[in-house]
Structures are given as structure tokens and as C-alpha cells.
Curated annotation (Swiss-Prot):
Protein known as: Inosine triphosphate pyrophosphatase
Location of the protein in the cell: Cytoplasm; Nucleus
Keyword Membrane tagged: no
Catalytic reaction annotation: ITP + H2O = IMP + diphosphate + H(+); dITP + H2O = dIMP + diphosphate + H(+); XTP + H2O = XMP + diphosphate + H(+)
A molecular function (GO) term: dATP diphosphatase activity
Organism: Eremothecium gossypii (strain ATCC 10895 / CBS 109.51 / FGSC 9923 / NRRL Y-1056)
GO terms for biological process, alphabetical: nucleoside triphosphate catabolic process; nucleotide metabolic process; purine deoxyribonucleoside triphosphate catabolic process; pyrimidine deoxyribonucleoside triphosphate catabolic process
Xref: Gene3D superfamilies: 3.90.950.10
Ranges that cross the membrane: none
Amino acid sequence: MPNLVFVTGNANKLREVRQLLGGAALPYPLVNEPLDLDEVQAASLDAIALHKCRSAAARLPPGTPVFVEDTALCFDALGGLPGAYIKWYVQAMPLCDIASMLDAFPAKTARAVTTVAYCDAAGAFHTFSGTTTGRIVPPRGPTDFGWDAIFEPAGEDKTYAEMDKDKKNAISHRGKAFAAFREHLCSPSQRPPPPATA
């Protein structure tokens, strides 16, 4: 039986995805592979994720189910920027500077979006998306997981970073995308065929 490969070298992301998928009776064992994939520059998160998934599938043995995840943080006042480029912003500048990009705007609203792109064992590609609306705030809580400390979901008084993991996973963009992915993985069409009998 093949493994279900999650392309990531990010230990925090792997831990969170294991939590999000862990309660399901997955058809394959989950492993990670830190492949270095080219990222296409595109406005569409689906296009970026599908490009990465196709690249990953081409580098793995045929029939290996593989998925990638891509996330965007879209500031409404900036027309959706930084969007899919948020991870480069996080690497290049402190979170307080990212939050201050909205200082000149009255609206601090934003959307957090995740797309999971999956290539199943038959070679078919699928995407699953989740969105959470909220607002950008000065950093609050631990700053060791991306931009969680500056995103406060709508209707909440805590940033993702201040929430316990179960609460965050229940309402987050990533949680929503992986709930749809988990449902697909557990569908009868995704079950591996039984071993051939002699």
C-alpha cells in the first residue's frame, strides 16, 4: 500500500495537518516529504497549489497519492495583497511591520484562504479550499507559526496564535480546507483496491 505524501518540510504545518486529518480512517499512512518545488507566480491560489502538486506527483513513483497546501492572507484594503506572497513577507519582515501596512486604512479586514491540491493514486487532481474572514491586528500571542499572531477571526477576541489548537482548527481556513479533503479521502472512491488473491 502506498503512503499518502504531504509535501512539506515545515514541522509546525505537519503537526497541524496530522491533527486535522488524524481523526479520520485514512486509506493510506500519512508521511511527509520536503520536496523543493518551484512556485509559479499567480494570483490564483488554486493555480499555485495545482502547479506544485503536479510537480510533486512527477517526482514521486507513479500511483503515489500526494498533496500540497498553499495559504494566502488577503488584505481587503490592499486589493487582496499580500495574498499568496504572505510567506515571503513573513520571512522578510517582522509581523508588526506586516500589520502596520494597514495603518493608513480604516478597514483592517482580511481573508485567510487555504487550498489543498491532491493527486490521487489514479493520477486525478482535486482541490479543496477553506476561507476565514477576520481582521489584522498588532501581534498578540506566540509568533512562531507564520502570521497567526496578527489575524483575529471575525466574531472572536483572540488571534489564531492566542487560541488553543482545537479551537483554531475548528474555525480556521486550513481546518475548513482539510475537512473537505478528509471527507474526500474517506470516500469509497479513494479506498485502495483489495490485494489480488492467487
